Amino acid sequence: MKSSLMVLALLTAAAQASGQDTTQGQMCSKVAVMPAPTGNAQNRMLSDDAEVADRVGVTKKIIKPDQAIAAQVVLSAGLLHHAAVEYRRSPTPPMVHTRMAEFFYVVDGEADLILGGTLTHPTCRNSSNLVGDAVEGGVTHHVTKGTYILVPENTVHYFTNIDKRQGMTVLDLHVPSPAPDQY
C-alpha cells in the first residue's frame, strides 16, 4: 500500500501537466463552491496500511442500502488536497472535474471505467464539477484490484458494471491543478 500511495502522488503530478481543455468545464464558473470535505483527517499527511484498512472497514459499514458510494478521508492538507477510501456499490453519474486531477488505486473489486468522451446533458454540481446523464464516446477499460487510474482535469470518467457481489473499493486522491505559470 505504501508504494501505491507514492505512485498515486507521482501520477497525479503528471495529470496536472496533461489536463485536457474542454468547453464543458467553463459552464460552472459562477456556481457556489463546494463545502469542505468531512472527516477527521484535516492536515493529516501520513498514513499506513493498518489505518487505510480500518477506513475501508468503516466505509463498508456506514454505507446505507440505497447509497451508491461512501467515503472516508484518509489524508488531507487543507481543503485543496485529500485522499479518501471510497466504497462503490453501484454507479454514480459520469463526472468531469474542471480544476483538479484525480487518481484512483483499486483496492478491491472490479468495474468498467469509461474515460474520455463527452457528458450528455451536463449540469453543474458545484463550481468545478459537472455531472451528466451518460457518456458519448470515451474508451471503456475493465479495472480490477491493483489497477492505477489517472484522470486529468476536464476528463470525463464513469465507473459502471461494478461487481454486484463485493462492490469496489478505491483509494481516491484529488489534487487541484496549478495555474499554468505556477508549475
Positions of predicted regions on the chain:
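Short histidine-centered beta-strand/loop micro-motifs
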Residues: 92-98, 160-162
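Short, conserved beta-strand element in jelly-roll/cupin
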Residues: 98-113, 117-119, 127-134
